[in-house]
């Protein structure tokens, strides 16, 4: 027996639609019927502060980010790095992280992790100063 599923990311609801977060967050786990993994497509428009100055970390989850388009500016703890398309980034549990797009092209990235079946993220308010040139809110 062959068991597989195919879903186009744009056919999955953007959970940030209707909010002021600039960008898209499309979790594909349910649509694909994933049992052990979580997979989310994240799109960050040009010159946008996707997490709006906040950050987060996970207690147990190790995350894999796959940058497939654009260059993403990521912060891990006190370090800020530029991550170009074609890069893979592993982030260990308890590592504070956030990201924004300082470039002229939309960033597309995939966040992949094991599925716990419960929330594991802790938000960090005021993780880094908002970029004064970045869009902080979704266009109406």
Q: For each of these PLM feature ranges, what is it?
A:
Residues 78-93:
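Short acidic-glycine-tyrosine-enriched beta hairpin
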Residues 41-45, 57-74, 112:
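Short, conserved beta-strand element in jelly-roll/cupin
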Residues 64, 71-73, 80, 96, ...:
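Structural motif
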Residues 1-38, 45-46, 124-140:
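A short, N-terminal "cap"/entry segment at the start of jelly-roll beta-barrel domains
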Residues 74-75, 91, 97-103:
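Short beta-strand His + acidic residue motifs that chelate non-heme Fe in jelly-roll/DSBH
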Residues 35, 45-50, 71, 115:
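Short, charged/polar surface micro-motifs in flexible loops or helix N-caps
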Residues 29-38, 49-63, 77:
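A short beta-loop-beta micro-motif enriched in histidine and acidic residues
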Residues 98-140:
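Double-stranded beta-helix
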